[in-house]
Amino acid sequence: MIIKCIAVDDEPLALDIIKDYISQVPFLKLIKTFNDGISVLEYLASNNVDLIFLDIEMGGLSGTQLLKTLQKKPKVIMTTAYRNYAVDAFDLDVTDYLLKPFSFERFLKAVEKSCNSLNEAQNDHNQPKSDKDYFFVKSGYKILKVNFDDI
C-alpha cells in the first residue's frame, strides 16, 4: 500500500528533514510540500491525501486551526518544537506527535502507527455489512427475535 502524504512546515530546514525521511520509506509518496496552512486548505479542497506531516506554529493559520477546519481529516502526524500542544493535538485525533528534533527511528515509528491505522480503516471499510437488522436469542423454551434498534 502506497501512502500519499504532504508535509507542512514554515521552516525550510525542518521541511527538508521531513522530505529526506519520507524519501527513505518506500511506501510513502510525498505529493507536495507547503509552508502555510491556507495553501493546504486550498489543496485539500480538490485533492485527497492519506497522511499529513503538520507543524503547529506557523504564520497565519496554525496546524491546530487547520485541523479544526478540515471536514474530512486524513491521518496526521504533528511535527513541532513545542510540548505544550500535545494534549490539544491528540484531542484532534492526530496519529502521533513528533517533538523536534526527532530521529529517523522515531519518525518511522509514527509512520508505522499511521500505516496500521490506515490499514485498519481500509479493512473495516471492506468488511461486508450484514443485511440483517435483528438476531435471535434463546430464552427458556422460546426463541426470541430481537431488533438491533430495540437495544
Identify the role of each PLM range.
Residues 13, 24, 37-125:
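CheY-like receiver
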Residues 27-30, 150:
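Glycine-centered tight turns that cap/initiate beta-strands
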Residues 112-151:
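Conserved binding/recognition cores within well-folded domains
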Residues 18, 86, 151:
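Conserved RecA-like P-loop NTPase ATPase core
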